[in-house]
Amino acid sequence: MSAADVEYRVRHQAFWFVACLAVLVAQIIAEYLMGRVPICACGYVKLWEGGVNTSGNSQHLSDWYTPSHIIHGFLFYGLGYLILRRKPLAARLLLALMIESGWELLENSPLIIDRYRTATMALDYYGDSILNSAMDTVFMCLGFFFAARAPVALTVVIAIFFEIFTGYVIRDNLTLNVLMLIWPVEAIKVWQGGL
């Protein structure tokens, strides 16, 4: 590869990464305009919020739902690989970021917040802080980059481990969250409420 080819490739990748950063910034601005709180109303930021049905859940840097966002990264890497195989990795990341950011905006809309509160165990859920939502997107990116480098089998094993572990500890995970959001099962809601 010539020096000119390398320079072109670096500039091309830089374009895609700047576009990725722009999506994250747009997500943050949109959530601010939606009236989301920047950080936890408690006034401080924690690295980890271990409570599930607490006022601090979905308000700090990470929580029990962080593994779900890492799994999003695994899944979105796979999707990008399938439909954008010939595009640079950063272009596939842009697709993943657009999906994740779109989900974060939808998740923090009154429609989905109300749905969570009526159909799932998240009775006191009032939406994510902007910081938590942005970090959810960053964790998705970490999952994406992990999936891009790790063997598929390892990525699948880690996803299964995350699902089983969080399901056991907090009685919720990505699979249950999606199920309860789309097609609530009363028996699961009762089981989750027993935590």
From Swiss-Prot:
Family listed: Belongs to the UPF0314 family.
Keyword Coiled coil annotated: no
Locations listed in the record: Cell membrane
GO cellular component: plasma membrane
Entry's transmembrane regions: 14-34, 64-84, 128-148, 150-170
Organism: Rhizobium etli (strain ATCC 51251 / DSM 11541 / JCM 21823 / NBRC 15573 / CFN 42)
Protein's membrane topology: Multi-pass membrane protein
A Pfam family annotated for this UniProt entry: DUF2585
Protein name per its UniProtKB record: UPF0314 protein RHE_CH03951
Keywords: Cell membrane, Membrane, Transmembrane, Transmembrane helix
